[in-house]
Amino acid sequence: MKLLHLSDIHLTAPGATIGGRDPRANFERALAHALRDHHDAELMVITGDLSDWGDLTDYQWLRQRLDEYPLPVRLCIGNHDRRAAFLSVFPDLADENGFVQGIHDTAAGRCLFLDTAHPETHAGRYCEDRLGWLEARLAEHDGPFLLFMHHNPMPVHLAPFDQIRLLDEAPFRQLVGRHRAKIRHVFFGHCHLPLAGSVAGIPASSLRGTNHASFPLFSETRLLSASDLPQAYGVVFFGDDYVTVHMVEFGYDGPIRVEGSPDYKAWDRETMAR
């Protein structure tokens, strides 16, 4: 089974830019690239920061664009989103407490989409109501589960990013840790960085966004880093007993070579010339 993971698309008004890049144009590039190479994906998930300022017009445009897209797409919200504006356009994605949380079953397992947004702060929260929802979902089904969320649920050891991580990380990790045998993977966004690790013993990964990129600048302790690294999305393959995660840099414009020999048993300088 194949799944596509996008994050941090940061939609703006048409023609507006962030860091000299056009978020709408780059999101369109990501959609086209993904459909060209991965039209057989079972699901696409976008893990938050759908709009840069939570503007209603961004969500309206996104709804229209995704309604036209041939692959099924599910959404999480992030710190740049406004829950009320989002739910006015996507009302079917609210849980019983008014948070943007839900379920989608796939061949690889049951996907749970989590809402870690908190108004007017870039840090994430996961309150008692949301923890209760997640506990109930994990308890009512045998799994396996795939968790999708915006904020990083563990430290990344870059001080500016960790100030805006999921602040309720301890109760969150305790909860998922109790169910770790049923959870295959945790996918998140927020940092605009390729990241891999574990959450309470559960494999976790993140990636760059589809517009602007960060950089792991460990010497910077106050401000978030920004770079001109290529835009990216994720391609995830699931087998019975493995998960493989790729970050595809669709924004890379340089040459790509093929090399080596189709006969991979050949072991000589001539056929292996590069």
Where in the sequence are the language-model features?
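N-terminal active-site segment of His-dependent metallophosphoesterases
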Residues: 1-61, 139-140, 156
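Binuclear metal-dependent phosphoesterase catalytic core
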Residues: 21-24, 175, 195-274
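His/acidic metal-ligating clusters that form di-metal
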Residues: 30-43, 124-203, 235, 264-274
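Metal-dependent catalytic neighborhoods of phosphoester/phosphodiester hydrolases
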Residues: 17, 46-67, 82-95, 158-163, ...
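Extended active-site neighborhood of metal-dependent phosphoesterases/phosphodiesterases
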Residues: 56-136, 171-182, 223, 227-237, ...
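Beta-strand-turn-beta hairpins that frame and shape the catalytic cleft
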Residues: 1-5, 103-113, 138-146, 199-204, ...
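Active-site environment of divalent metal-dependent phosphoester hydrolases
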Residues: 12-15, 52-56, 79-87, 119-122, ...
